[in-house]
Amino acid sequence: MFRVFGSFGSKGNQSSGEEQSTKTKQVLKQANDFEIALKAMDFVLDDRTDEGLNLLKKAEMETGSDQTILTLARGVIEFLQATLSFETEEMKRAAITLGKAEQMSWKSKQNAEKTNFRSSSIYPPGTVYAVTYTESCLLHALLMLFSESMMEAAKALLKLRRAYTMLQDIMVTVKKAERSKNSSSPSPSEKSQESCGSFVSAETTFISVDIPYKLSSEDKSNPLLLEFAEKIYTMRMGRLSGAHIGNTPSFHRLRDDLGLQTTPSQASDRHSVSDDFDLEQATIDEFIHSGANLCYGILQVVLSLLPPAIGAVLSIVGFKGSREEGLRLVWKAIKERNVHGCIGLLGLMFYYDGPFQFTDADFDIPPNDNGSRALNKSRTNDSSLLPGYMDSATLLHPGKILEDALLKARALFPNSALWLLNEAKMLAGKGRLRDSLALMDSIDVNSIRMRQVKSLMVFERAILLVNLHEYNRAADDLISLLDISDWSHALYTYFAGCCYLENWRMTQLGLLNDGKEQFYKERARELIFDAPSLLGKKTFKSKNLPLDRFMLRKVQQFNNMQKKLNLQEPLDSIATSPVHELAYFYNGYNRMTENDLILTKKMLTEYHNPAIDSEDPDQELIRNLLLSLTLRRLGDAERGLALLDDIVLPKIFYIQNGKVKYFKKTEDPWAYPAALYERALFCWKLGGMESLNECREWLLRAQNYAADYELSTRIGMKIKAALDRVENALA
């Protein structure tokens, strides 16, 4: 007997003769086209977009191909390109394709239900197209929200509402199927015997896990069906091992640790695909539950992070998000070896180590044992979460589990700079800045095929170089982005100017002696004060980005100070070094080493110019806020707290009749709620678990400073995430 693999699940009604043979061909064709779509998307994740798109184009031209999944695959590829660059034309193209996929998915779902086309042994007819519909809806809605058009935003909410409702129904079916499968799972020995593929030429019959019903004797011996089923099996096994896109099996490259100098694990030689994945899982079933887990998980996390006022309104119309449940589902999705797992991993990397600091490393509150769940390292078909498995690997602090997931992606996609970049960011998050830089420098950015990934690599390296105070290279990277990305030429230019300004100040303090003092001075003046003129030349969105508006306000401040003090040199009108503000927005203070922090402290306290010596209250507030953070990171939390309590906070709020009253300041509005957030963090660092109630009070004060300012989303989400963590610990 030829066994493609595994059993065929529950039995369905048998058709007779030619009718059933035609039906079986359709079922296998659908599985084949889904495998082609998954392969095409994996090409993109390996920095080989053209190969992926060519594969889709070839498949689309075949008679009888599943145009729905092929169109969605193209839409996902274009979505990844658009969200990595946020460029207008790419976002428009992705939106059009996803809109088509949405319409096609709905029609395919209705047709499958009407004809009772059953391609899964555990899910009702049409379920897979319900998943493609919600996936295209969700991605399309996100693009509409990014457009910043009120009309498009309203349409996006309607799409999200439809996706949310359908996903709720799908998840009921998925959970029911998982419970049924777990209760009937065979023993490991039985599973091993059933999973072994074999071929005996004297008996050319077969069964396939992709066919959800019992085959007729004619179909079992049909050589064309046998060959088609074997092809799908080979495609799936290649995908699971990572060998399907021309790379050698991924386990040969799998490492145990992060960093450029690490070598493949010795255990990789004994590794088997069956160690990680369920070999009896049909392609359609895999797509259904990985897609449902990913989409519903992301939607839940996003809803949970919305500001309270918006969240309360949405909950009235049925939108409610649970961050823990959402994270749990995304973690389940990344266990799958497909594009859903990869997108889920990118989402988790952004959540745990992104610029919004949803999990501030300094706010390391241990999880509440009653409310948190530990992540299980089990296979896909087992229960994905078990309490108490690993104390250090919870939903709050995934630790080594997140690291291992990223290392698997690096092994699977050795040609992609996207995963290398994420490894470098993870190293930086651990304070290993030099190791992170070495990893980034190990690749020639000009060899990166995806322009969007190339621009991300260059920008992230510039941020890292700023944290290392290597401002020459940082400025070079930022200026080079003018030829790579259309995202924000004004911000790139301003940021580069701030780097040159810091170098000029370092030469004045004798900390840098390279004979380029005049060059730094001229470039800083030119780039900082010319940056606003570039705002009208960028191509992204109809409105300026939040950081664009921040930059514009800062340059206006400098110009006003120059007039106020009647200064000849524009650079003397800049008080607190703006590069340190930008470092805060990108989590720099949590990543700097001790030596880097010492240099930051020196630059904040020892440099003087007319603007600094004028002791402008707003500029002093910024300087003292950043200095207090620096002191805390250097281990002098008591002194940092005194600075915050005595000098910074009295300028932000006061207590009247037991109620908090805020000074509504407009000069640097991001700093006021940020200072209240940092006060909560001081409270935690000095008081530990006994101070959680006080931490909560400070975070509520930060959250209630509900002014609309240019960085309100970034700061507000960080505050809400911390508040949720504190309240979870207090529960």
Curated annotation (Swiss-Prot):
<feature type="modified residue" description="Phosphoserine">
    <location>
        <position position="268"/>
    </location>
</feature>
<keyword id="KW-0539">Nucleus</keyword>
<dbReference type="GO" id="GO:0005829">
    <property type="term" value="C:cytosol"/>
</dbReference>
<dbReference type="InterPro" id="IPR019412">
    <property type="entry name" value="Iml2/TPR_39"/>
</dbReference>
<feature type="compositionally biased region" description="Polar residues">
    <location>
        <begin position="10"/>
        <end position="26"/>
    </location>
</feature>
<comment type="subunit">
    <text>Interacts with lipid droplet proteins PET10 and PDR16.</text>
</comment>
<comment type="function">
    <text>Inclusion body (IB) resident protein that interacts strongly with lipid droplet (LD) proteins. Involved in LD-mediated IB clearing after protein folding stress, probably by enabling access to the IBs of an LD-stored soluble sterol derivative that acts as a chaperone in inclusion clearing.</text>
</comment>
<protein>
    <recommendedName>
        <fullName>Inclusion body clearance protein IML2</fullName>
    </recommendedName>
</protein>
<dbReference type="GO" id="GO:0005634">
    <property type="term" value="C:nucleus"/>
</dbReference>
<dbReference type="Pfam" id="PF10300">
    <property type="entry name" value="Iml2-TPR_39"/>
</dbReference>
<feature type="modified residue" description="Phosphoserine">
    <location>
        <position position="265"/>
    </location>
</feature>
<feature type="modified residue" description="Phosphoserine">
    <location>
        <position position="383"/>
    </location>
</feature>
<feature type="region of interest" description="Disordered">
    <location>
        <begin position="1"/>
        <end position="26"/>
    </location>
</feature>
<comment type="similarity">
    <text>Belongs to the IML2 family.</text>
</comment>
<feature type="modified residue" description="Phosphoserine">
    <location>
        <position position="378"/>
    </location>
</feature>
<feature type="modified residue" description="Phosphothreonine">
    <location>
        <position position="380"/>
    </location>
</feature>
<feature type="modified residue" description="Phosphoserine">
    <location>
        <position position="392"/>
    </location>
</feature>
<keyword id="KW-0597">Phosphoprotein</keyword>
<keyword id="KW-0963">Cytoplasm</keyword>
<dbReference type="GO" id="GO:0005741">
    <property type="term" value="C:mitochondrial outer membrane"/>
</dbReference>
